[in-house]
Regions:
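WD40-repeat beta-propeller superdomains and closely related acidic/aromatic-rich repeat-like regions
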Residues: 1-328
C-alpha cells in the first residue's frame, strides 16, 4: 500500500494507463509517482480520464477544461456564451470517439480530443448536473431538473430526446448495452428509463443521498452508494430491474457506503465508507477484502483500476492511498 497526505481535499480519484491519479480542490492533479501539475486557478470540480488513456481532463471553477499529463498541461476549452455558469459542473470522455463532453450552467459542450476546431454547444432549460456518453460514444445523456436529455454528440442543430420525471436529477449513466439510462436524484432514489419505449423505472428505498453508481459483471449489475451496504440492482434481460428487488453486499449498520467503483465487464466492486474504511468484493464470491481497515474521515474519492487489481481512495481530510487488490 502507498499512502499520501494532501493539503487539499481530493475531488476525485482515477486510474490512467500509468497508475493512480488524484484531482484536488487546490486546482492540482497529482500522479501516483509524485509528479503533479498545478493547473487550475481555483478548485478542480470534476475530472475524467482523457480518451487516450493518458492523464486527466479536468474542469475547474475557473471555467477551463485542461488536459493534464505528467509534466505537461494544456487548455482544451473554456466556457463560452450565455447559459454558462462560469465554472465546469460535470465532465465525461469517450475512448471510442475521442470526444469530451462538459457542462457549465445550462450548457452542454462537446469537443474532440483529435480536432481542436470541433465544438458543439447545446442549451437546456435548467442547470445540467451530470453528463455521460453511451457505450459507442455517439450519444450523450445529461441530468437536469425534471429528468434527462439525450443528444447526438456531433449534430449541431437538434432538439434533445427528453426523458421526463419530476424532481432534481443529480447524475446520469448509461447501461453498458445502451438499453437503459439511470439517474441519481436529490430525494435519495434512482430513476431509470428503458430507451426503446421510454418506460420508467423507480428505484428507491435509500436512507441517504446516492453519490455514486457503477456497472459491473458484464453489465448485469448496477452498484450504488447511499445505504449501509453497497446496493446491487439486477440488469439482466430486456426489463432490467423492473419488477425486481435490489440486494446488498457489505452491510454494516454502524456506517454508510459513500462511494462505489467498478470496471465493467469485471465483477469486482470497491466501496468507500463513511467511517473511512475501504473494501473490495466480488458479489459472486464470499466475504469482503478490507484494503483500508483504519477508520477515519469519510471516503470522498474512489477508483478501481481497469483490470480491477488496484484501488485508489481519499478521505475528506486529504489522506489518500493506493493498494493492490487480493480476493481469495
Amino acid at each position: 500500500m502507498t499512502t499520501f497526505s494532501f493539503d487539499a481535499q481530493v475531488t476525485s480519484a482515477h486510474f490512467d494507463r500509468s497508475g493512480a491519479v488524484f484531482a484536488l480542490g487546490d486546482g492540482s492533479v497529482r500522479f501516483e509517482d509524485g509528479v503533479f501539475d498545478a493547473v487550475h486557478e481555483g478548485a478542480v470540480l470534476c475530472a475524467t480520464v482523457h480518451p487516450s488513456g493518458e492523464g486527466l481532463v479536468t474542469g475547474g471553477d475557473d471555467g477551463r477544461v485542461i488536459w493534464s499529463r505528467k509534466g505537461e498541461a494544456g487548455v482544451l476549452a473554456t466556457v463560452q456564451g450565455p447559459g454558462t455558469g462560469g465554472w465546469i459542473d460535470a465532465i465525461a470522455a469517450s475512448p471510442q470517439t475521442k470526444l469530451i463532453a462538459f457542462s457549465s450552467g445550462k450548457t452542454l459542450s462537446v469537443i474532440d480530443a483529435t480536432d481542436a476546431g470541433f465544438r458543439r454547444d447545446f442549451q437546456h432549460e435548467r442547470t445540467v448536473s451530470g453528463v455521460a456518453f453511451d457505450p459507442g460514444g455517439r450519444r450523450i445523456a445529461t441530468s437536469t431538473y425534471g429528468g434527462a436529455c439525450l443528444w447526438f454528440a456531433r449534430i449541431a442543430d437538434q432538439k434533445p430526446t427528453k426523458l421526463v420525471w419530476a424532481g432534481s436529477h443529480t447524475g446520469v449513466t448509461f447501461s453498458p448495452d445502451g438499453a437503459f439510462v439511470v439517474t441519481t436524484m436529490q430525494d435519495m432514489q434512482l430513476h431509470g428509463w428503458r430507451l426503446k419505449d421510454s418506460k420508467n423505472m423507480r428505484m428507491g428505498g435509500y436512507p441517504s443521498k446516492i453519490r455514486a453508481m457503477a456497472f459491473l459483471s458484464k453489465g448485469s449489475l448496477l452498484a450504488t452508494s447511499g445505504a449501509q451496504g453497497a446496493v446491487l440492482w439486477p440488469f439482466t434481460g430486456s426489463n432490467g430491474p423492473m419488477g425486481r428487488e435490489a440486494s446488498e453486499i457489505g452491510f454494516d449498520d454502524t456506517t454508510t457506503v459513500t462511494l462505489v467503483a467498478a470496471s465493467n465487464p469485471h465483477g469486482r466492486l470497491a466501496a468507500g465508507l463513511g467511517d473511512g474504511r475501504v473494501w473490495v468484493a466480488d458479489p459472486a464470491g464470499q466475504g469482503l477484502n478490507v484494503v483500508k481497515a483504519e477508520k477515519g474521515a469519510p471516503i470522498v474519492a474512489l477508483a478501481l483500476s481497469p483490470d480491477t487489481t488496484r484501488v485508489a481512495w481519499a478521505d475528506e481530510d486529504g489522506r489518500a492511498g493506493v493498494a493492490d487488490v487480493v480476493i481469495d
